[in-house]
Design a protein with these regions (language model features):
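Structural preference for beta-strand elements that scaffold enzyme active sites
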Residues: 20-24, 59-60, 89-95, 125-130, ...
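Acidic-and-aromatic substrate-binding clefts and catalytic sites of carbohydrate-active enzymes
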Residues: 64-73, 99-104, 137-138, 193-198
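Beta/alpha (TIM)-barrel catalytic core signal, keyed to glycine-rich beta->alpha loops juxtaposed to Asp/Glu
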Residues: 2-10, 134-315, 319-327
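N-terminal binding-site loop/beta-alpha segment at the start of enzyme catalytic domains
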Residues: 1-90
């Protein structure tokens, strides 16, 4: 049997000076977006979940202005105040987001996005700041031109407003181009490196070759690999047909045969990749915080991995046909 992982082992984020645990927590669900996830999250649930996160050994929390149109950040800000500040050596990450009305994403919008986040979170700087979803900008030239939004991101780093900068997006082709032109400390990919999809594999390898740390978010394909396809019939934020869920059910069958949780296998599949610094798991209840930490170190027999090696997986973009719903 392969040695179990520990969720709280820490990994350096390149040369940034930051270290994060092998598992991080995500807060998209805490933005209360039932159209995206299929369920709502109350203020009380969010409060209890964030208190559990701050009390846990996990030291990294990922959020965005885009999660519930600022609702996730508002809830995190309240939790930070209730906690008397962030825990020691805690790495909070947020993202620069475009103007949600116009999709404008120039330098002034990038600056304003950070100002909005810092004000909402109640802090004066952020450990990790990602540039979020450039593919949805009204003009990619506003993002990449001289004096554009990405230049502004690195300017804010030089001003000490953040310690490390990253790129968090969906489209890996755009990300591949940008990592060749800008010295990101970190890249964040989501839903594109799971036990049933390896679309982001080439991006992850390219980042490793450049010394860029990689966060892999949504190892459960937006929830189905954790909650089970029998009751959660969604895949990558959309309702899913039996055909779409077939690869998930093939994995579930192997896990059931060996008596191991599919969620633990899905999480550790990501953790086994040495080119991934941390795996981001969304949490919306305190018990999910505890469960994630347990799954990270759940003993999984070698026979499971051997059998799963023959299960088919996709390399297509799993969000290619997704109908995007803002916030």
């Amino acid at each position: 049997m392969e040695m179990a992982f520990s969720a709280n082992d820490r990994v350096a984020l390149g040369k940034s000076g930051l270290k994060v645990t092998r598992v991080s927590f995500g807060t998209a669900g805490l933005g209360n977006m039932p159209e995206t996830f299929g369920f709502a999250v109350s203020d009380k649930e969010a409060e209890e979940t964030l208190a559990a996160v701050f009390a846990s050994p996990i030291n990294c929390l990922d959020t965005s202005r885009n999660y519930g149109m600022g609702e996730a950040e508002r809830r995190i800000g309240r939790a930070i105040r209730a906690n008397g500040g962030l825990p020691k050596d805690f790495v909070l990450a947020t993202k620069l987001d475009r103007d949600f009305q116009t999709n404008k994403f120039d330098a002034s919008r990038a600056r304003r996005s950070l100002e909005e986040s810092l004000e909402t979170l109640g802090i004066d700087h952020i450990p990790l700041l990602h540039f979020h979803d450039p593919e949805y900008a009204s003009s990619l030239d506003d993002v990449t031109c001289k004096g554009g939004a990405l230049d502004e991101l690195f300017k804010m780093k030089s001003e000490g407003l953040c310690q490390a900068v990253g790129l968090g997006a969906g489209r890996t082709d755009i990300m591949m181009d940008l990592i060749k032109e800008y010295p990101f400390d970190v890249v964040l990919t989501h839903n594109r490196y799971t036990i049933v999809n390896r679309h982001a594999g080439p991006l992850i390898d390219a980042c490793a070759a450049r010394g860029i740390a990689v966060f892999n978010a949504a190892p459960y394909a937006s929830g189905v690999l954790a909650q089970g396809s029998a009751t959660y019939k969604r895949y990558v934020y959309q309702e899913a047909t039996d055909e779409v869920l077939a690869p998930v059910r093939a994995v579930e069958a192997v896990c059931a045969k060996h008596g191991v949780p599919t969620g633990a296998v899905a999480l550790q599949f990501s953790m086994r990749n040495k080119n991934l610094a941390s795996t981001i798991c969304g949490v919306t209840k305190p018990e999910f915080v505890k469960q994630t930490i347990e799954w990270a170190s759940y003993p999984i027999p070698d026979a499971v991995w051997n059998e799963l090696a023959s299960v088919a997986f996709s390399t297509d973009d799993p969000e290619a046909t997704r109908t995007y719903v803002l916030g």
